[in-house]
Amino acid sequence: AFYKNEVEQRHWYGLWDYGDIMHTYDAQRHCWRYDMGGYAWQNTELIPTLWLLLAFMRSGREDIFTMAEAMSRHSADVDIYHFGDLKGLGSRHNVVHWGDSCKEPRIAMAGHHRALYYLMGGDPRIGDAMDDVKDADYATLNMDPLRYFYKKEEMKLPTHARSGPDWSTYCSNWYTAW
């Protein structure tokens, strides 16, 4: 109910915004940090799609399902790169949804973002999006998630895969596709 009320109050509608929420509230300014990269749009950070769908299954509340549905569709259509060198990656919480250079596979993870919604409703567009991310590991060859931490000339391998956010995403994508 809180997220749905925020969508109504803040008019987060339209192709780019509907189904997403802001990530961090600014207590000093008494507003969402809509203008600060790293704090603005949530882009499925903290997996609200999963816990909202689980809350719906426990309660049967339609308002919870419609918010989870909107978030699942938004993340599948807006937050994921569907073609090109970044196919399978997603943009972390940015001022605009595709904003800065934080492109990571975890934002596009098939298993916890969309698989449950797909199984509940069979939306073929969600199935297409899950298929788009199954080879996200190849996209990190084009954009290393840790490129700002390591000098390219000192790297022994072409990219990095963190055990938590990256490997768990790859395994989730492969398992979901299987």
Question: In which residue ranges do the predicted regions lie?
Answer:
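Catalytic cores of extracellular degradative/oxidative enzymes
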Residues: 1-178
